[in-house]
Design a protein with these regions (language model features):
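Bacterial N-terminal signal peptides that target proteins for export
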Residues: 5-16
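Polar, glycine-rich mid-to-C-terminal structural blocks
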Residues: 304-390
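Bacterial N-terminal signal peptides
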Residues: 15-24
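Short beta-strand-plus-loop segments that form exposed binding edges in beta-rich domains
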Residues: 344-348, 433-439
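Short acidic, glycine-rich surface-loop motifs adjacent to enzyme active sites
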Residues: 260-285, 307-308
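Autoinhibitory N-terminal propeptides
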Residues: 12-13, 26-147, 154-155, 163, ...
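Active-site core segment of subtilase-fold serine proteases
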Residues: 163-217, 267, 367, 371-428, ...
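Subtilisin-like serine protease catalytic core
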Residues: 143-253, 268, 301, 316, ...
Length: 443
């Protein structure tokens, strides 16, 4: 189908947040904003088109503000953000979580004292034998340790969704002493809903999102459940808890961790915060702003634990390692209710561009309906739109592609957001080819 000549391929890492991938034949250049993340550019495009009903956009805006990470180039950046009407929330060094007025995102990113703006992205939630395989019983007994460890005197923090404050697991083993010290409910429609007393917590009963999700209750039980009236207990069942019901936006999650650490410090207690959530987006090398900020928060008496995830049997990640092959894969969606999808592709080595080809494929006729041909990231516009029609002309597919040479690790990146038109039945219609080489490859 394509002819590849004398190609030198490097390894490519491909992270897939499964949904769908749309390709097309028309190549239209869009405005480029070099100090905005690809995801931020996509959201601004939707704002410009007044596509406020789009679920991708709704998940990243808070009222009239865009939730984002901002890295300043100089200390003057903080005053400039304030002057622009921004709300600085959590700050670690030169990076902060910030609410930026929607009307000011472009102007803020253009300031010389601002180095980079990265819009907040949605994350997803990620066992009665967990204690056994983690050797918790030995820690409880103090086996080969200076003392037993049960969590007593420690704060267990959890940032998650769907929290039931009244659950029996959040009392002690006898079901008498209530162990949740306080909660911040980010999902509440009220500004900063905090509950700081047992009476307030039991009166509130649960977080505002608990009618559709109970993941946080489940996770907190594993981490710190008291085991009242059951043989099953959490890992640190004598600890106290500070919980944050989160919106699942990564900048809000950072704010939640910061809140728990600061409140634990106020109480004079060591703290472990659990994050049983994640996504498939990013370079997976510790250079995204969420990773940097969380890394800066930890230290003596402040630990963060992260779940391994639930994606082992899901095709959400692949890589091209062979020097004599080209990655070719269909990209499908895991949830047919989704109207959009995201694909994030990274070069494995700094300074090495890679090439991509997108096909629109009809399975019934076994034909390629349209193709972009191979294009290289070092020659394509940073912002591009591809469109194509289905064979009968009733459906229009669109993919918005945002590329960058990420300044914080020197690696080329292609981030794609694609729209899934209503009525598409073929779940394997989008065929992706990825290859790297020293010169552009064309098919």
């Amino acid at each position: 189908m394509e002819k590849m000549v004398n190609m030198k391929r490097k390894s490519i890492l491909l992270s897939l947040l499964l949904a769908i991938f749309v390709v097309g034949g028309m190549f239209a250049q869009e405005p480029t904003y070099s100090k905005m993340s690809p995801y931020t550019r996509i959201l601004l495009d939707k704002l410009a088109k007044k596509d406020t009903a789009n679920s991708l956009l709704r998940s990243s805006i808070s009222g009239d503000y865009l939730s984002a990470f901002v890295k300043v180039a100089t200390d003057e950046g903080w005053a400039s953000l304030d002057s622009a009407g921004c709300r600085i929330r959590t700050r670690t060094g030169d990076i902060a979580t910030v609410l930026i007025p929607l009307s000011a995102v472009e102007s803020v990113s253009g300031l010389g004292c601002i180095q980079y703006v990265s819009a907040s992205q949605p994350m997803r939630a990620s066992m009665d034998s967990a204690r056994y395989y983690s050797d918790v019983a030995d820690a409880y007994a103090g086996t080969k340790l200076p003392q037993p460890y049960t969590g007593k005197g420690v704060i267990v923090g959890v940032v998650d969704q769907g929290l039931d404050f009244t659950h029996p697991n959040f009392y002690d083993k006898e079901g008498k002493a209530y162990r949740i010290k306080q909660v911040w409910d980010q999902t509440s429609p009220y500004s900063k809903a905090e509950y700081r007393t047992e009476e307030e917590l039991l009166d509130a009963a649960c977080s505002f999102d608990s009618d559709v999700n109970t993941h946080g209750t489940h996770v907190t039980g594993i981490a710190a459940g008291g085991g009242f009236d059951t043989p099953y207990q959490g890992v640190a069942n004598e600890s106290d808890m500070i919980l944050v019901a989160t919106t699942m936006q990564n900048s809000d999650i950072v704010d939640g961790v910061d809140y728990i650490f600061k409140e634990s410090e106020r109480l004079g207690r060591p703290c472990v915060v659990n994050l049983s959530l994640g996504d498939g987006i990013g370079g997976h090398d510790g250079t995204n702003f969420m990773d940097i900020m969380l890394d800066r928060m930890v230290g003596p008496g402040k630990i963060i634990t992260v779940a391994m995830g639930n994606s082992r049997d899901m095709p959400v990640y692949t890589e091209l390692m062979s020097p004599s092959d080209t990655l070719r894969t269909f990209v499908g969606r895991s949830n047919t209710g989704l109207s959009y999808g995201l694909v994030d592709i990274w070069a494995d080595e700094p300074g090495e561009p890679f090439s991509v080809c997108l096909d629109l494929y009809d399975r019934e006729s076994d034909e390629i309906l349209n193709t972009t041909g191979f294009f290289a990231l070092d020659t394509m516009p940073k912002s591009s739109v591809f469109t194509s029609e289905s064979m009968d002309g009733t459906l229009v597919y669109e993919a918005r592609m945002e590329s960058e040479l990420y300044v914080f690790n020197g690696r080329y990146r292609l981030f794609i957001q694609f729209n899934y038109p209503e009525g598409t039945k073929n779940e394997k219609i989008f065929l992706l080819h990825v290859a790297t080489n020293n010169t552009p490859v064309r098919a």
